[in-house]
Amino acid sequence: MDVLEYLLVLLLVISIALNLLLLKKVRELNRELREVGARVSVTKEELTAIRSRLERMKGEL
């Protein structure tokens, strides 16, 4: 029974370590996703400005 307990504890430690690594990776990916989202919203604002300029140019022609 001693070996079985040792293996269970070892598996528990490995599982906790892998979960911590996964948590770190998830946080990194969430940060990257927020950064990409911020860039996309700026792009949408720029697109709106370009469209309004095009409409003004069409009106001038």
From Swiss-Prot:
GO cellular component terms given for this protein: membrane
Keyword Transmembrane helix on entry: yes
Keyword Transmembrane helix: yes
Localization (cell): Membrane
Record keywords, A-Z: Membrane, Transmembrane, Transmembrane helix
Transmembrane segments: 4-23
Membrane topology: Single-pass membrane protein
Domain of life according to the entry: Archaea
Name by which UniProt lists this protein: Uncharacterized protein AF_0697
